[in-house]
Amino acid sequence: MTLYNALERERKEQDKRNRDRELKNKFDELIKARQYMEMEINGLKFVLPKKASDIVNEGSALHHCVSTYVDRHASGTITIVFIRNASAPKKSLYTMEFCKKEIVQIRAKYNQNPPKEVWNAAEIWKKKVLTRGRKNA
C-alpha cells in the first residue's frame, strides 16, 4: 500500500507540473497576443495578469472570486484585466472581466462596485482596445 501511495502522489505531482507548464505557456501566448490591451488612462493603469498566480493573488487581495476565472482567461474565452492606480501599479484596486468586446464587470474590494470615474476610464480603454484589436487581427 505504501508503494501505491508514493506512486499516486508522484503521479499527482507530475500532473500538477504539467498543468502549471501548460498554463504558463497559455499565459505567455496571451500576453504576446494582447499586449496592446495594456495602457494608462486618466491615471489608471490597465494591466494583464502575467501568470495564473497573479489572478489568484488578485482575488485574495480584493476578497472576490476572480481566482475561479483562471482557466477561462488562459483559454482566451475571457480577458481578465487589473486596473491599478498609475502611481501604485503593484497595489490591487479593481478587476475587470472583458468578453466578446464588452466589459462584463468591474469589481473592487469585497465585490463592491468601483467609482464612476473607473467605469469612464474603462469605457475609454474598451474603445481603444477595439480599435487597436482590429489593427492586430
Q: What do the predicted segments below correspond to?
A:
Residues M1-A137:
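Catalytic-core elements of nucleic-acid end-processing and repair enzymes
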